[in-house]
Amino acid sequence: MAEEAQVIACHTVQEWNEKFQKAKDSGKLIVIDFTASWCGPCRVITPYVSELAKKFPHVAFFKVDVDDLKDVAEEYKVEAMPSFVILKEGQEVERIVGARKDELLHKIAVHAPITA
């Protein structure tokens, strides 16, 4: 049975580097959810992001707490939470700021359509 898709939470820079590199090497579309424990809208959208991970198992979803991984947040110039950065072949192709569910779904579907 296939492993159920999930959001990969990274808490250290080493963990981020290893898991992110593995996802890049796989060629998957990557969605990074930049969040913070104190961010109300982040908590609201978290269950939705988990549902998207199940709906799009061919996409790598990451959750990055900006307080835990400040360097990663700075690298991607994250200034507000939640922010979603979508990468294709290692390059940023989309950025969504705010808990905008419809836009997030649309942008993922454009770059990683579900093939039945």
From Swiss-Prot:
<keyword id="KW-0813">Transport</keyword>
<dbReference type="Pfam" id="PF00085">
    <property type="entry name" value="Thioredoxin"/>
</dbReference>
<keyword id="KW-0676">Redox-active center</keyword>
<keyword id="KW-0249">Electron transport</keyword>
<feature type="site" description="Contributes to redox potential value">
    <location>
        <position position="40"/>
    </location>
</feature>
<dbReference type="InterPro" id="IPR036249">
    <property type="entry name" value="Thioredoxin-like_sf"/>
</dbReference>
<dbReference type="InterPro" id="IPR017937">
    <property type="entry name" value="Thioredoxin_CS"/>
</dbReference>
<feature type="active site" description="Nucleophile">
    <location>
        <position position="42"/>
    </location>
</feature>
<comment type="similarity">
    <text>Belongs to the thioredoxin family. Plant H-type subfamily.</text>
</comment>
<feature type="active site" description="Nucleophile">
    <location>
        <position position="39"/>
    </location>
</feature>
<protein>
    <recommendedName>
        <fullName>Thioredoxin H-type</fullName>
    </recommendedName>
</protein>
<feature type="domain" description="Thioredoxin">
    <location>
        <begin position="2"/>
        <end position="115"/>
    </location>
</feature>
<keyword id="KW-0963">Cytoplasm</keyword>
<feature type="disulfide bond" description="Redox-active">
    <location>
        <begin position="39"/>
        <end position="42"/>
    </location>
</feature>
<dbReference type="GO" id="GO:0005737">
    <property type="term" value="C:cytoplasm"/>
</dbReference>
<feature type="site" description="Contributes to redox potential value">
    <location>
        <position position="41"/>
    </location>
</feature>
<dbReference type="InterPro" id="IPR013766">
    <property type="entry name" value="Thioredoxin_domain"/>
</dbReference>
<comment type="function">
    <text>Participates in various redox reactions through the reversible oxidation of the active center dithiol to a disulfide. The H form is known to activate a number of cytosolic enzymes.</text>
</comment>
<dbReference type="InterPro" id="IPR050620">
    <property type="entry name" value="Thioredoxin_H-type-like"/>
</dbReference>
<keyword id="KW-1015">Disulfide bond</keyword>
<feature type="site" description="Deprotonates C-terminal active site Cys">
    <location>
        <position position="33"/>
    </location>
</feature>
